[in-house]
C-alpha cells in the first residue's frame, strides 16, 4: 500500500514551542502523528542521521533568515549542509539518493550545489523569484494585489499544491 506522508523536521532547537508554532501555522492541517521534530544541525552528520535523511523521499533546505545574516552566509550554510549530505551518501550510497529542494539567495551559487550533490535536485532562487514577480507586477498592473493575497501570512491565503491525478 501507499506510505503515509511523514515529515521529519531538523531544527537547531526543536522544542514544544516550535511544535506549537507549526501547529498554529497549519491549523486544521496539523497532525502530530505525521510530524517528527528533532534537534540538531544540518551541518553535522549526527543531526542528519536523526531524521534518517538518506531514506527520505525529499529533503527541503530553506535558506537561512537573511534578516539575521547576509545572503552569502545563507547560501554558504546551504552549501555546507549539502556537502555534509553528499559525503555521507558517498560513504554509504543508498539505492537512490533523495530529491533535494534547496533555496538559494543568489542564483549564481546554483552551479556549486549541482556539482556537489549526486542525486536529483531542484533549486529555488529567492532573488530570481522576487525579480520575476516584480517584472510581472510591472507588466500587469493590479497583479500586486493578487500576489499580496497569496503570499501574505494570513489564514486562508496559502497556496496548496495537489498531484495532477487528483484533479482529473
Predicted feature residues:
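Cytosolic regulatory regions of ion transport systems
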Residues: 1-168
